[in-house]
Structure formats: C-alpha cells, structure tokens
A protein has these predicted regions:
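Domain-level detector of nuclease and nuclease-like folds
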Residues: 40, 47-158
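Short, His- and charge-rich active-site/binding loops that engage polyanionic ligands
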Residues: 1-66
C-alpha cells in the first residue's frame, strides 16, 4: 500500500498498491479459470479504521471497477486460498472497466501464456497515475483513491 508516494514525509496515503510481484509457473496458470468470486472484497480492518486502506464500499457507485494487480486466475493455480486472497481491495486499483476488461486483461492472459511457454515468469505490476487526468474515488473525509490512467507490467523469465 502507498503510505507516502513522493517520499517527502507528508504522509499522503493513496490507498492502492504501489506494486505487486509474484512468480507464475507453468503448472499454476489456470488458463483464465478461477474459483467462484466472493460477493464482497475484503480489506484490512485495522488499516481501514486508520484511513489508510479502502473497503468494498469505497468503490460503490463510483463508476470504476476494481482491477486486480495480481490476476485472480494467476493465483487460482496456486490454490483456493491464494485465489481468494486476490479478492482484497489491497490488491486492487480503481480503473475504467474498458481498461480492466480490455488491454489489462489481455496483458494478464499474455503473461499466463508466457509462463506456459517458458516454464515460469516473474511478474511485477504497478499502477501509473498522471496529474493531468487524475480522478478520485472514495470518501472525501476518509480516504480518496486515485483512478489509474495506465499500468506497468514487467515479466521476466527465470
């Protein structure tokens, strides 16, 4: 989670992951299949109470979707618990559904295919924000989260 993104000690919390990193092996790629999605996204109650992390309601009626940083079906091959643990707001960034179900999804499938072809890949994913087009969701008096305008994903072979 981002607690102070510009390292100037002003304590700006963005409420989204700075990045996620994980290894995806050939035998773990579920080919887009995953376990049943829970009806609500979980959060860390302590971080939410402190105004550092969002909760499921932060996205409600925002017009934005919760974009997984670690793809749900990437984790599905690691087991039901890993699959379920991707369904937390600590693993999500607000984004337009057009991006989430479009280029973002295509990149997630591409890295899964690379894991099949190469045997394993390390994946590092993080949000990109631009000042000019920054939109926010959440509670003005609690925690505002920026809507990402892009993402960076690096995949490297073992």
């Amino acid at each position: 989670m981002s607690f102070d993104t510009d390292q100037d000690a002003d304590g700006i919390a963005l409420g989204v992951p700075d990045w996620v990193a994980y290894e995806l092996r050939r035998d773990e790629w579920a080919g887009g299949k995953s376990h049943k999605r829970p009806s609500r996204w979980s959060t860390d109650p302590d971080l939410h109470q402190r105004g550092i992390a969002p909760d499921d309601s932060s996205y409600r009626n925002s017009g934005y979707s919760r974009g997984h940083m670690c793809m749900k079906s990437h984790a599905a091959g690691m087991g039901a618990a890993a699959d379920r643990e991707t369904h937390t707001v600590l693993n999500a960034c607000p984004q337009m559904q057009r991006m989430n179900g479009g280029i973002w999804l295509a990149i997630e499938y591409l890295t899964g295919r690379w894991a099949n072809e190469q045997g394993a890949v390390w994946i590092v994913t993080g949000p990109v924000f631009t000042e000019a087009s920054r939109n926010w969701i959440g509670d003005l008096y609690r925690l505002l989260m920026p809507v990402l305008t892009g993402s960076e994903e690096v995949a490297a072979r073992r």
